[in-house]
Amino acid sequence: VACGICHSFTADGRCVSLLKVLMTNYCVYDCQYCVNRRSHDTRRTAFTPRELAHLTISFYRRNYIEGLFLSSGVLRSPDYTCERMIETLSLLRREYHFNGYIHAKAIPGADPALITQLGLLADRLSCNIELPSQQSLSRLAPDKTKTSILKPMSQIRDQMCQSQYEVARYHGAAAFAPAGQSTQMIVGASPETDFQ
């Protein structure tokens, strides 16, 4: 199990052990930097939401992990993938009463309503900016656009701000990604300078 465990920090600064896992390594995209790209000849697999929820709660109950870091290749479409992630987190939170930490990757291109549902179930959301320019994105990740990546990042930021206001003001208000938002950028795969 150790190879699937990573560490992260909660909103209150605690370091937690997380099960870091993909919902699936199937992907409709052909990003040149990704081992799970459509054109790469690799063995494919996918969890069902129930399988992944059961695996997570089993590890949690044995004290192997304190939370989940859930990402995914894009299976069929961004919406379909996000729906499966939501179903997994919903099973964990509502059926298994999982109170551990959850970091989920928002899927660019998914319906904003699905991103909202994901953020209400997860402690932290992230959406990878991938590359510093549209030109590099077009060359290395031809199926993605800067807009499809920046749109959910902006939505997450705005909903976090609104949620912080509501939680401070109204008793029982639902928290949206209370531990924040993060992103990742690939450095060195494209010709941009640090300044750019």
Each language-model region and where it sits:
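Glycine-rich, often proline-containing surface loops adjacent to acidic residues and nearby aromatics
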Residues: 64-69, 178-182
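Conserved AdoMet/S-adenosylmethionine-binding subsite of the radical SAM
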Residues: 53, 58, 76-196
